[in-house]
Amino acid sequence: MGKHYLPNLAHREEMLREIGFASIDELFSDVPEGMLKEFNLPGGKSEYEVFIELNETLSKNKTALEMPSFLGAGTYFHYIPAHVKYLIERSEFLTAYTPYQPEISQGMLQALFEYQSMMAELYGLPVVNSSMYDWGTSIAEAALMTVRLHRGKRKRFVIPKAISPEKKAVIETYTRGANLEIVEVPWDESGRLDIEKLKEAVEDSAGVYVEMANFFGLVEENVREIGEIAHEAGAYFVVGADPTMLGIFEAPGELGADIAVGEASYLGNPMNFGGPRAGVFAVRNDKKLIRQMPGRIIGMTRDAEGKRAFVMTLQTREQHIRRAKATSNICSNEALVAVASAIHLATLGPKGLRELGEVILKNTAYLKKRLSEVAEIPFEGLYFKDVPVKFKRPYGEIHEALLAKGIHGGYYIGKHFPELGETALFAATETTRKEWVHALIEALKEVA
């Protein structure tokens, strides 16, 4: 292992001579010595030695199959049919980057067209782009879009306080440069959006955003009414929805949404430590809205010979048109994630998606019922996936005690919402087993 393949020493010496330096140290002599550190890497190893070392390190991890996990709060453990991974790993789909001559990749464009078509049916809105980075990005882009639709005359965007801190951070980061004011509406005693406070906040706003199930997991019962309040104030109505709940709940379009957003990666994609993801972005059939959509839209047409062809119908990003006219600076989308979502959704079909939603709802209700035996559920109502649980002891201590018993507890939200005290979100999906819930409750009886 004594040879220098990288960096190539001969090439390095040649480059140094060309720019008039004798050594690398001389080249970086203006860097203060106190900031320099020794770069002491160990010697090289064989591939087998590296394999053994990495395997030993990775074996310390515990997957959601090996260790009962009740973590949720935006990242959930769903079952993915085996063929989804097989199909997206085919070379026709698994590419390094979005092609700059996309019409060459007819298979990829058709897959994205199918994704758009299925999401349009699912969200009840006819026009869907080929994905954003994630749910939070979709909300932020929707906020900017509502301002553009008002020609900059309205610069306020209303969101619920009971929203994921990560989504909120993305929204604030995205909109800061546009001088957009983000207005938060608190929850009422039921844990849902406070309608009276919304009526006060909506005045002169560009858009109003609400989620069909908020960060606490509570299903919002007044989505249609919230939309009516937004429209009466002249604001656009943006609805966020988890696609796995849309087999059993009304679609955002049916509830009056002008724009709908969501997280496509909940279908067909593993947790992956939180990413990559794919944001859903859909609008109603209004040319004014379609022209202001971010991202890219795949369309179906006929070529010069009359054959069916898939093309990028709209791609209003800054690399393709004048920057001042661009609707977004997103340079790529999450095409592979979107294709995986489309494959999973096509596998489920309407009946399978309904059954998936019913199982999640049933498992969430069972988890809530059992958790109420050992702790307080702050809000009553219908929950989907997440359930808030309030404890008397510091939750950090409880969480560590659960880990010691081989159980991953919920996500502590007291740090984001101090008014909720020692509260954590515990999540259930179709993968949650009753024996896991039983083990959790027995453990909590000891440590909580």
UniProtKB/Swiss-Prot annotation:
Coiled coil: none
InterPro entries: GcvPA, GDC-P_N, GDC_P, PyrdxlP-dep_Trfase, PyrdxlP-dep_Trfase_major, PyrdxlP-dep_Trfase_small
GO molecular function terms attached to this record: glycine dehydrogenase (decarboxylating) activity
Any one of the GO BP annotations: glycine decarboxylation via glycine cleavage system
Gene3D superfamilies according to UniProt: Aspartate Aminotransferase, domain 1, Type I PLP-dependent aspartate aminotransferase-like (Major domain)
Enzyme class: oxidoreductase
Catalytic activity, as annotated: N(6)-[(R)-lipoyl]-L-lysyl-[glycine-cleavage complex H protein] + glycine + H(+) = N(6)-[(R)-S(8)-aminomethyldihydrolipoyl]-L-lysyl-[glycine-cleavage complex H protein] + CO2
EC number: 1.4.4.2
Keyword annotations from UniProtKB, A to Z: Oxidoreductase
Family as reported in the entry's similarity comment: Belongs to the GcvP family. N-terminal subunit subfamily.
Free-text function comment from the UniProt entry: The glycine cleavage system catalyzes the degradation of glycine. The P protein binds the alpha-amino group of glycine through its pyridoxal phosphate cofactor; CO(2) is released and the remaining methylamine moiety is then transferred to the lipoamide cofactor of the H protein.
Subunit structure: The glycine cleavage system is composed of four proteins: P, T, L and H. In this organism, the P 'protein' is a heterodimer of two subunits.
Protein name (database record): Probable glycine dehydrogenase (decarboxylating) subunit 1
Originating organism: Thermococcus gammatolerans (strain DSM 15229 / JCM 11827 / EJ3)
Gene from which this protein is expressed: gcvPA
